[in-house]
């Protein structure tokens, strides 16, 4: 039986929540590979919203570094089986 690293096979549920005047996505929950960088989530949101101006926050608290891996963010800040990512078109929190 071949073993793979847990980061390569684990999928993380990312719950995208609109904040402020940002448009609400038709589908708010997506599965993302744990090995992906958070920058992939940001790029995906930019494509969905057709906007270059985007501010993202984890748990309405902080804006993570785009180089962070999704699995690390989930392990440290995820709850109820998902990573909550708030997004806005203008700065929502300092």
UniProtKB/Swiss-Prot annotation:
Ubiquitous. One of its GO terms (biological process) is autophagy. The modification N-acetylalanine is found at residue 2. Disulfide bonds: none annotated. It is found in: Cytoplasm. There is a cross-link at residue 94 (Glycyl lysine isopeptide (Gly-Lys) (interchain with K-128 in ATG5)). It holds the Pfam family APG12. The keyword Transport applies. The keyword Glycosyltransferase does not apply. InterPro entries: Atg12, Ubiquitin-like_domsf. GO terms for cellular component: cytoplasm. Keywords: Acetylation, Autophagy, Cytoplasm, Isopeptide bond, Protein transport, Transport, Ubl conjugation pathway. Ubiquitin-like protein involved in cytoplasm to vacuole transport (Cvt) and autophagy vesicles formation. Conjugation with ATG5 through a ubiquitin-like conjugating system involving also ATG7 as an E1-like activating enzyme and ATG10 as an E2-like conjugating enzyme, is essential for its function. ATG12/ATG5 conjugate has an essential role in plant nutrient recycling. Belongs to the ATG12 family. This is Ubiquitin-like protein ATG12B. It comes from Arabidopsis thaliana (Mouse-ear cress). The gene is ATG12B.
């Amino acid at each position: 039986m071949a073993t793979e690293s847990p980061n390569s096979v684990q999928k993380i549920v990312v719950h995208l929540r609109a904040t402020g005047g940002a448009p609400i996505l038709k589908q708010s929950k997506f599965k993302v590979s744990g090995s992906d960088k958070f920058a992939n989530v940001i790029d995906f949101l930019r494509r969905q919203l057709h906007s270059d101006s985007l501010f993202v926050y984890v748990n309405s608290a902080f804006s993570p570094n785009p180089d962070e891996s999704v699995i690390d963010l989930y392990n440290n800040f995820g709850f109820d089986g998902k990573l909550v990512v708030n997004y806005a078109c203008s700065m929502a929190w300092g």
